[in-house]
Curated annotation (Swiss-Prot):
Complex and partners: Homotetramer.
Active site feature: H54, D57
Keyword rRNA-binding attributed: no
Species classification: Bacteria, Bacillati, Actinomycetota, Actinomycetes, Micrococcales
The organism of origin for this protein: Clavibacter michiganensis subsp. michiganensis (strain NCPPB 382)
NCBIfam families in the record: xylA_Arthro
GO MF, one example: xylose isomerase activity
Protein name as catalogued: Xylose isomerase
Biological processes, Gene Ontology terms: D-xylose metabolic process
Length: 397
């Protein structure tokens, strides 16, 4: 398998990722700002297919209409010259002081109205550029103090805003869907819709739930101690994986935004196997962008920025290669069969069977030999996982 990225791999990068200057809460930038044209040209040379951005990444908050249009035109020119596309756009409702208490859920009604206007304008830009996904990360939607935010009221305002956006894209005829990006905390002490499960539940309350899915990020779910692959499987199962953010995270701590695979490598392996092949038991795989939302380390110069961008794509392709070998190994197939992984797809009830039938079936309870599972009938899960790790480590081909 070739390890050189191509457009067919659908690798994309956020402008805020390759453009990260190294500033953090404890120190200023260590690199200069990145011009958008240079960013587009360099990721094109590396083999990526897409660039994503927040509005404030492309033109500064408070820019005049002329300044805004100048940057949009420069981006369009670079896209035309390189063939790079914009698959996703999002809006920054977290950096400017006006959003100190959030955008859609700020306690200040005027701020909420301003936030909606800012988003509507950027949806128009997304449609103009051909983006089909609009991500919503509510980084400031939350609180540090329980008494400071009425969560029930905040969720209702969140719902009101998302419903309005759904009306807008429908009435405009835009081919755009929304993807909510969960995160448990940071920058707020607690963020609304903190995990993938919270977001999926919230989506079901909306007036147009078919227009709204999720954009889970590796590090965000792992900050909450969750298994990212398992969460992605549920999002796929519910038809809600509209976009995905790939990066690396090493445990429950601050959002590290490492290169993909440079954190929990085993979970990254199972994730790529799922995205490419549908999981060990089959099921739906993912055909959308493989989007890298990482930060080049503060220690790096501009050469290190592009090395880290390339590393994301190479890590994904290496893991894809390892997943293909894992699937093709006859011993793995034997271990999967011994572990009865596929049997989960056999309905527990027979066709047409009701609770009356299962209550009448003595073999399911009265005559079932439960003691036979003591000292016997192991599932072989450890052997299966050992085979997976040996493939991950390149010990098996």
């Amino acid at each position: 398998m070739a390890l050189t990225p191509t457009r067919e791999d659908k690798f994309s990068f956020g402008l805020w990722t390759i453009g990260y200057t190294g500033a953090d809460p404890f120190g200023g930038p260590t690199r200069s700002d990145l011009d958008v044209v240079e960013g587009v040209e360099r990721i094109s040379e590396l083999g990526a297919y897409g660039l994503t951005f927040h509005d404030d990444d492309l033109f500064a908050f408070g820019s005049t209409d002329a300044e805004r249009q100048t940057q949009i035109d420069r981006l369009k020119g670079a896209l035309s010259d390189t063939g790079i596309v914009v698959p996703m756009v999002t809006t920054n409702l977290f950096s400017a002081p006006v959003f100190k208490d959030g955008g859609f859920t700020s306690n200040d009604r005027a701020v909420r109205r301003f936030a909606i206007r800012k988003v509507l304008r950027n949806i128009d830009l997304a449609a103009e550029l051909g983006a089909q996904t609009f991500v919503m990360w509510g980084g400031r939607e939350g609180a540090e103090y329980d008494s400071a935010k009425d969560v029930r009221g905040a969720l209702e305002r969140y719902r009101e805003a998302v419903n309005l956006l759904g009306d807008y894209v429908t009435d405009k005829g835009y081919d755009i869907r929304f993807a909510i990006e969960p995160k448990p905390n940071e920058p707020r002490g607690d963020i609304l819709l903190p995990t993938l499960g919270h977001a999926l539940a919230f989506i079901e309350t909306l007036e147009r739930p078919e227009l709204v899915g999720v954009n889970p990020e590796v590090g965000h779910e792992q900050m909450a101690g969750l298994n990212f692959t398992a969460g992605i499987m549920q999002a796929l199962y519910q038809g809600k994986l509209f976009h995905i953010d790939l990066n690396g995270q090493r445990g429950i701590k601050y959002d590290q935004d490492l290169v993909f695979g440079h954190g929990d490598l085993q979970n990254a392996f199972s994730l790529v196997d799922l995205l490419e092949n549908g999981g060990v038991g089959g099921g739906r795989s993912y055909d959308g962008p493989r989007h890298f939302d990482y930060k080049p380390s503060r220690t790096e110069d501009i050469t290190g920025v592009w090395d880290s961008a390339a590393a994301n794509m190479r890590m994904y392709l290496l893991l894809k290669e390892r997943a293909q070998a894992f699937r093709a190994d006859p011993e793995v197939q034997e271990a999967l069969a011994a572990a009865k992984v596929q049997e989960i797809y056999t309905p527990t009830l027979n066709e047409g069977e009701s609770y009356d039938d299962i209550l009448a079936d003595r073999s399911s309870y009265e005559d079932f030999d439960a003691p036979s599972y003591f000292d016997a009938k192991g599932f072989g899960f450890v052997r299966l996982n050992q085979l997976a790790l040996e493939h991950l480590m390149g010990a098996r081909s």
